Design a protein with these regions (language model features):
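Classical eukaryotic N-terminal signal peptides for Sec-dependent ER targeting/secretion
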Residues: 1-14
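Single-pass alpha-helical transmembrane segments
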Residues: 428-446
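A short beta-strand element within beta-rich, extracytoplasmic domains
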Residues: 146-159, 166
Length: 446
């Protein structure tokens, strides 16, 4: 009778497990976030910490940057200026005045919340000094290493530039390398054959390309954006819908150049030539030519070397909240008194928990290599943890889980082979299903 009462619950749990399994198949990235740094486990000595590789969640990194323009007086409005529409040279009713809030277009409007009407945007001065080039450098600085997780997207309120370069720095702006070139004619502008991100392969992913996809004059709103395609590059390893994140994490873990490619401290947008409407420059109406950007999106996370799952913005600075006995803005060194072995970056492998590579106390002495996955295998279903300890399956004990755990006389008998066998003795107790054991039942069924 009692077992019959449990049947509906068991069937419901089985259905739930099945649906969870299907969800994991369709959205595999949910297990690949590495958002837990440690958890408590039971060992022979009692409760202990099990350490895992971890990283902060991805977020909108434009909330934490500092923007710099060069030349510094390139923003419109000082003195006030009237602009004409690129498509209609006779529509000259747009005014920029830095002294009037409603008419000003300062740089911070590239990072405010979009959706307001009218749209807010930064705007440069017009091309009044033609034929001298109208060029602007927009530098985004985080004073912290960050890892990009999604496409960089620039939305232009004006026509998209006819020539532009996106650059990155890994040393806080001391040196720069190009990420991508943009032009209406790549051969003419940069002596490069035009390509797209779809032309890249696993072998050429790190190549710097010039694309013509984002430099044509716009007619519709969707043609206002310029992208640097991060996800298309991820997809070369993770598949078109990023289902195989295990493959991507494996590549990032073992290929330093690949991981560095998606890591930055600064971005620089070099605007080299404004939109001209694919025609000759009208020297009689230079108020038509300028740059205007309404939005910049940079999605990423703090780089914490897989030693932290959170990052804080305090007193104008980003910093990792380090775990694993590490310290520093990037968790890139061991804490004081934790130099028992050299600091090491965490590892995504083995998936899904990775390897923490924690710093250990200085007086800990050399770390013995108790087990591995080759010669010194943990027995009876045990697992090797950081080469230092076997986590034994229930019912087994010993350095390599080689012995049965005996609870009392008669619980286990030594066999002639030197191995032990377990014997179950009925206790006569009756167990009822309660809310307390429900999560354990769910885990065991799944």
């Amino acid at each position: 009778m009692r077992s019959a009462m449990f049947l509906p619950v068991l069937f419901a749990l089985q259905a739930l497990c099945t649906s969870v399994g299907h969800a994991m198949q369709h959205y595999p990235a949910v297990w690949g976030h590495y958002d837990v740094c440690k958890s408590q486990i039971y060992t022979e000595e009692g409760l202990a910490w099990d350490y895992m590789a971890c990283q902060p969640e991805a977020t909108d990194m434009t909330e934490y940057l500092r923007v710099t323009l060069d030349p510094p007086n390139i923003t419109c409005g000082d003195p006030p200026e009237t602009y004409c529409a690129l498509e209609n040279p006779y529509m000259c009713n747009n005014e920029c005045d830095a002294a009037t809030e409603e008419l000003a277009h300062p740089p911070e409007l590239m990072f405010d919340i979009e959706g307001r009407n009218p749209t807010t945007f930064w705007q440069s001065t017009s091309w009044k000094k033609y034929p001298k080039p109208l060029q602007v450098n927009i530098t985004l600085s985080w004073n912290k290493t960050i890892e990009l997780t999604d496409d960089i997207v620039l939305t232009f309120e004006s026509g998209r530039p006819e020539q532009m370069v996106l650059e990155k720095s890994l040393d806080y702006g001391r040196t720069w390398t190009p990420y991508q070139f943009y032009a209406t004619d790549c051969l003419d502008a940069f002596t490069m054959e035009p390509k797209t991100a779809n032309d890249l392969t696993q072998q050429t992913l790190l190549d710097i390309i010039c694309t013509e996809d984002y430099s044509r004059g716009y007619v519709w709103k969707n043609d206002k954006t310029v992208r640097f395609e991060i996800k298309d590059r991820f997809a070369l390893f993770a598949g078109p819908r990023l289902h195989n994140m295990a493959s991507l994490y494996g590549q990032l873990d073992t290929t330093k150049n690949l991981r560095d490619f998606f890591t930055i401290t600064d971005l620089r947008i070099r605007l080299l030539k404004p939109a001209t409407g694919a025609t000759m420059v009208d020297e009689n109406n230079l108020s038509r030519y300028f740059y205007a950007i309404s939005d910049i999106k940079v999605q990423g996370r703090c780089k914490c070397n897989l030693h932290a799952n959170s990052c804080v913005f305090d007193k104008g600075k980003l910093g990792c909240e380090c775990e694993h006995n590490t310290t520093g803005p990037d968790c890139s060194r061991c804490k004081k008194h934790y130099h028992g072995r050299a600091w090491s970056v965490g590892s995504y492998l083995p998936i899904p928990k990775g390897t923490a590579n924690i710093c250990i106390p200085s007086n800990h002495g050399p770390v013995p290599r108790v087990c591995d996955n080759a010669m010194l295998r943990c027995q009876n279903g045990g697992t090797c943890h950081h080469h230092q300890r076997c986590h034994c399956s229930p019912g087994f004990t010993g350095i390599l889980c080689e012995r049965a755990r005996c609870q009392g006389p008669g619980d286990c008998d030594d066999q002639l082979s030197g191995q032990a066998s377990l014997h179950h003795r009925p206790t006569g107790r009756h167990h009822t299903l309660t809310l307390v054991v429900f999560p354990l039942l769910f885990v065991s069924l799944c």
